[in-house]
Amino acid sequence: MSDFIVGLTGGIASGKSALAAEFEKLGVPVVDADLVARQVVAPGPVLDAIVAQFGAEVLLTDGTLDRQTLRQRVFADTAQRRVLEAITHPAIRSELQRAALAALAPYAIVAIPLLTEAGGRAGYPWLDRILVVDVPVALQHQRLMQRDAATAELADRMIAAQATREQRLAIADDVVCNDGVLEQLTQATHRLDADYRARSDR
């Protein structure tokens, strides 16, 4: 059972998955909020609440969530995005904590893209450390256009819909700069792993 939990966050296209993969190579369990978010919107009470708020047009013909339709709606409307987060975040938080505590390791990483937007440590008081993957906004923009084939306008909207780089850095206990050099990412992971293992033994 892990009694030391690190929250990993960063902006869209910052390289959170790449950093999480480096920790996994060292045997560290990683609980992914994106995966948990997909699980909690499977047919059930959370999906029912989403449909009640946004209408049946956010469902596919098989009764599952049409993620693309819902994503387009909430990115276009800040108020609707907040409504969606109010429905999904409590269920996601609960499952993330349960999975992290159940991990059989000295510590666990919980990857939470919207950690800053959800109030940082106030929203997740059970986190022992917050690790931020930092990347210049221009590089985020470039990666979104390459990775997701996003238009420049959509990339701007996706970045603007999240917390600012400065807001993320303000909640960080630890920061890793991910400018695309894998060797530097690996070195940073090894350094942090040693630190977290030492802290978990205290």
Curated annotation (Swiss-Prot):
ATP binds at residues 13-18. It holds the Pfam family CoaE. Catalyzes the phosphorylation of the 3'-hydroxyl group of dephosphocoenzyme A to form coenzyme A. It is found in: Cytoplasm. GO terms for cellular component: cytoplasm. GO terms for biological process: coenzyme A biosynthetic process. GO terms for molecular function: ATP binding; dephospho-CoA kinase activity. This is Dephospho-CoA kinase. InterPro entries: Depp_CoAkinase, P-loop_NTPase. PROSITE patterns: DPCK (PS51219). Pathway: Cofactor biosynthesis; coenzyme A biosynthesis; CoA from (R)-pantothenate: step 5/5.
